[in-house]
């Protein structure tokens, strides 16, 4: 996978995606999430790949093991670069996801969502009824993902250093919640700058609105890219 900032294509239509991608004359690493995939379907993935871009298909699969395994068999045929599941589904579910993926695809990396970067300590305790710190909850889910054989996790940059210490440098830490200095926090709570994410051990960063909603997306992307790749 490219070591580039992953741009979250948080658009509702293929037309808006193409308008955005047409601004760039270089190969990108982009994220297609539920909103866009459910609107446009697999054909959009094929078109983005044909343009030479890497794709993170962010569907966060979470169901019984058999269902997730079968779903991953279908997604494997899209030949994206990165897919994910929810670690809360457990080791068996994650193992079945890998089996389904590998039936048709040996190259796609698979990672697990630990805790969303919108999660707060209060939400963790009172809504999820998890009576530990966010850091401990993330570590527990990351250990389950590692035990299942996944390539890494989605986590906040604030947990990256801990996960590197516990699970090694090759374990992927894909981190949303990235905001350049002075940018709006939006609905993210556990955030850092690109430079801080690199220093903390993130292997990849995901950036959406600071690029896609910028007055000059190309310039904003290059600034984030430069600060990430220092």
Swiss-Prot record:
SUPFAM superfamilies with a match to the protein in the record: Ribulose-phoshate binding barrel
Gene3D superfamilies (UniProt xref): Aldolase class I (3.20.20.70)
Family under the similarity heading: Belongs to the OMP decarboxylase family. Type 1 subfamily.
Enzyme class at the top of the EC tree: lyase
InterPro entries in the cross-refs: Aldolase_TIM (IPR013785), OMPdecase (IPR014732), OMPdecase_AS (IPR018089), OMPdecase_bac (IPR047596), OMPdeCOase_dom (IPR001754), RibuloseP-bd_barrel (IPR011060)
Protein name: Orotidine 5'-phosphate decarboxylase
Binding site for substrate: 10, 31, 58-67, 117, 179, 188, 208-209
The protein's assembly and partners: Homodimer.
Catalysed reaction equations from the record: orotidine 5'-phosphate + H(+) = UMP + CO2
Known EC number: 4.1.1.23
UniProt key word Glycosyltransferase: no
The keyword Magnesium belongs to this UniProt entry's keyword annotation: no
Molecular function in Gene Ontology: orotidine-5'-phosphate decarboxylase activity
Pathway: Pyrimidine metabolism; UMP biosynthesis via de novo pathway; UMP from orotate: step 2/2
Superkingdom as given in the UniProt entry: Bacteria
Function: Catalyzes the decarboxylation of orotidine 5'-monophosphate (OMP) to uridine 5'-monophosphate (UMP).
Alphabetically ordered keywords of this record: Decarboxylase, Lyase, Pyrimidine biosynthesis
GO terms of biological process kind: 'de novo' pyrimidine nucleobase biosynthetic process; 'de novo' UMP biosynthetic process
GO cellular component, one term: cytosol
Active site: 60
């Amino acid at each position: 996978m490219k070591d580039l900032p992953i741009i979250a294509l948080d658009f509702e239509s293929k037309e808006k995606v193409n308008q955005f991608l047409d601004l760039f004359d270089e190969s990108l690493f982009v994220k297609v999430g539920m909103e866009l995939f459910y609107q446009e379907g697999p054909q959009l993935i094929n078109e983005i790949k044909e343009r030479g871009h890497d794709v993170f298909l962010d569907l966060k699969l979470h169901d019984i093991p058999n269902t997730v395994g079968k779903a991953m068999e279908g997604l494997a045929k899209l030949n994206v670069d990165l897919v994910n599941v929810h670690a809360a589904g457990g080791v068996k579910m994650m193992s079945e996801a890998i089996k389904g993926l590998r039936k048709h695809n040996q190259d796609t990396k698979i990672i697990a969502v630990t805790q969303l970067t919108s999660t707060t300590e209060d939400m963790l305790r009172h809504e999820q009824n998890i009576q530990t710190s966010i850091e401990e909850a993330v570590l527990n889910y990351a250990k389950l993902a590692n035990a299942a054989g996944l390539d890494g996790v989605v986590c906040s940059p604030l947990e990256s250093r801990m996960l590197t210490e516990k699970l090694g440098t090759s374990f992927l830490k894909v981190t949303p919640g990235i905001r350049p200095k002075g940018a709006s926090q939006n609905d993210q709570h556990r955030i850092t700058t690109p430079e801080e994410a690199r220093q903390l051990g993130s292997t990849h960063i995901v950036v959406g609105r600071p690029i896609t909603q910028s007055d000059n997306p190309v310039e904003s992307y290059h600034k984030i890219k430069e600060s990430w790749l220092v």
